[in-house]
């Protein structure tokens, strides 16, 4: 169906009480609607002028009856289209057979087009956003291309290096080409790559002429290359990437931080690299002579200083030890005394009230509370107890068949010295208050 300028589509269903063919249906549509309306809505004239489209008929004959689905495109306005649709329902015969026609639906094709436009526009926008290159990405791409152009080759081994390698007073030795590019991204143009674990002769020679920093990965491979560099080159400073990271995978901020934190080679070489230094023809004569006296002086000074400190502060240390021992002894005695006091109070509690166990047995599994005022025992529900709590003062003893919570303690701490409950759930206990669980009393 060529929709063209179609605005609406009229879907019609026809049932004929006999066998008919397509041309019979189309003839009935044009023949039985002719003259019903004004000439402006005559189907033949409308079709000639293109106001309505080609009428499609899908026909099926079943058991002596004919069933047709008729589709009629219309570019008329909604009022004229509605009149035209209603006109089709006036058809009552097709060929020699009686027929009934019902309008199934009038579809506004523009709604479908709008929905299609919306979905398609959404899809196109998503594609544009995916394909759109951010300004930052463009900038970085241009910078990257310039940096790639800036990378040079040095020496007979064609080692990758930055453009300032010849003119700079200092150089940075890295592992590979990718590391040189990474440093170029950070604006560092005096790096040169070893390109392998075997240090080229060019690196050995240039390290003697310039202030040299070895900047290696923070992994086992980086450590091996560093050892190789220390054996063969005149290294002045050492810097490592963060532990477990490679130089090429390190951010600009981290690289700058690592290079600022570079340490002199004298500080790196100790027991760990002693055998390397001893076998290094470059470092053995110059560096070891510089490091060894300084190291011996530091160790000797530390030993002397330690002996002097021991002589000066030994009496004070001994006195302090005696004081600490006394404090520990006093704390132990205090703890023992507290334990005795608690045990004594438990004993007094049992004696004073003619068997506290019996009191607790009386309220166990009842949900009631029992308290003693002036030697008189009183039993209430907890709700009733709370109602009269303002009138109750100076209790000798309070027991409840419920857990003792912080709220209960805050409520009763100034009314009784002893509180007993099924269990104690308190985070902060007042100094003068004793808390016991049923199990502690019943033991």
UniProtKB/Swiss-Prot annotation:
Top-rank lineage group of the source organism: Archaea
Gene3D superfamilies: 3.40.1360.10
Catalytic activity: ssDNA + n NTP = ssDNA/pppN(pN)n-1 hybrid + (n-1) diphosphate
Cofactor(s) recorded in Swiss-Prot or TrEMBL: Mg(2+)
Class of enzymatic activity (EC top level): transferase
GO CC annotation: cytoplasm; DNA-directed RNA polymerase complex; exosome (RNase complex); primosome complex
Pfam families xrefs: Toprim
Cysteines paired by S-S bonds: none
Alphabetically ordered keywords of this record: DNA replication, DNA-directed RNA polymerase, Magnesium, Metal-binding, Nucleotidyltransferase, Primosome, Transcription, Transferase
Binding of Mg(2+) 1, residues: 175, 217
The EC number(s) this enzyme carries: 2.7.7.101
InterPro entries associated with the record: DnaG_primase (IPR050219), Primase_DnaG_arc (IPR020607), TOPRIM_DnaG/twinkle (IPR034154), TOPRIM_dom (IPR006171)
GO biological process terms held by the UniProt record: DNA replication, synthesis of primer
GO molecular function annotations of the record: DNA-directed RNA polymerase activity; metal ion binding; poly(A) binding
Residues involved in Mg(2+) 2 binding: 217, 219
Cofactor note: Binds two Mg(2+) per subunit.
Residue ranges annotated for the Toprim domain, each copy included: 169-243
Protein family (similarity comment): Belongs to the archaeal DnaG primase family.
Subunit structure: Forms a ternary complex with MCM helicase and DNA.
Function comment: RNA polymerase that catalyzes the synthesis of short RNA molecules used as primers for DNA polymerase during DNA replication.
Name of the protein in question: DNA primase DnaG
Organism encoding this protein: Methanococcus vannielii (strain ATCC 35089 / DSM 1224 / JCM 13029 / OCM 148 / SB)
Lineage: Archaea, Methanobacteriati, Methanobacteriota, Methanomada group, Methanococci
């Amino acid at each position: 169906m060529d929709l063209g300028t179609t605005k609406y589509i009229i879907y019609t269903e026809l049932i004929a009480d006999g066998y008919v063919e397509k041309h019979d249906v189309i003839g009935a549509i044009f023949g039985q609607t002719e003259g019903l309306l004004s000439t402006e809505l005559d189907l033949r004239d409308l079709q000639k002028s293109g106001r309505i489209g080609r009428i499609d008929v899908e026909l099926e004959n079943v058991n002596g009856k004919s069933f047709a689905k008729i589709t009629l495109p219309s570019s008329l306005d909604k009022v004229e289209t509605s009149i035209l649709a209603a006109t089709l329902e006036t058809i009552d015969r097709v060929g020699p057979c009686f027929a009934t026609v019902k309008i199934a639906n009038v579809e506004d094709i523009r709604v479908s087009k709008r929905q299609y436009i919306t979905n398609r526009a959404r899809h196109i926008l998503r594609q544009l956003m995916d394909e759109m290159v951010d300004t930052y990405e463009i900038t970085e791409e241009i910078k990257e291309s310039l940096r790639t152009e800036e990378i040079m080759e040095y020496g007979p081994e064609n080692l990758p290096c930055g453009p300032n390698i010849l003119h700079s007073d200092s150089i940075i030795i890295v592992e590979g080409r990718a590391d040189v590019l990474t440093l170029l991204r950070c604006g560092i143009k005096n790096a040169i790559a070893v390109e392998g674990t075997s240090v080229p002769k060019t690196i050995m020679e240039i390290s003697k002429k310039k202030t040299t920093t070895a900047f290696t990965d923070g992994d086992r491979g980086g450590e091996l290359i560093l050892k190789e560099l220390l054996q063969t080159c005149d290294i002045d400073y050492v810097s490592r990437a963060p532990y477990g990271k490679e130089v090429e995978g390190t951010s600009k901020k981290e690289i700058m931080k690592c290079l600022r934190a570079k340490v002199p080679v004298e500080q790196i070489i100790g027991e760990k690299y002693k055998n390397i230094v001893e076998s290094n023809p470059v470092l053995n004569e110059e560096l070891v002579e510089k490091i060894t006296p300084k190291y011996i002086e530091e160790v000797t000074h530390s030993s002397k200083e330690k002996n002097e400190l021991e002589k000066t502060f030994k009496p004070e240390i001994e006195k302090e030890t005696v004081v600490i021992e006394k404090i520990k002894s006093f704390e132990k005695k205090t703890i023992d005394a507290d334990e005795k006091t608690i045990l004594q109070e438990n004993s007094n509690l049992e004696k004073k009230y003619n068997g506290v166990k019996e009191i607790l047995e009386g309220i166990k599994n009842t949900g009631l509370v029992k308290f003693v005022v002036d030697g008189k025992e009183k039993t209430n529900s907890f709700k009733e107890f709370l109602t009269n709590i303002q009138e109750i003062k100076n209790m000798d003893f309070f027991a409840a068949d419920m857990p003792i919570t912080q709220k209960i303690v805050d409520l009763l701490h100034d009314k009784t010295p002893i509180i007993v409950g099924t269990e104690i759930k308190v985070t902060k206990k007042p100094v003068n208050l004793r808390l016991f669980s049923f199990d502690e009393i019943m033991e």
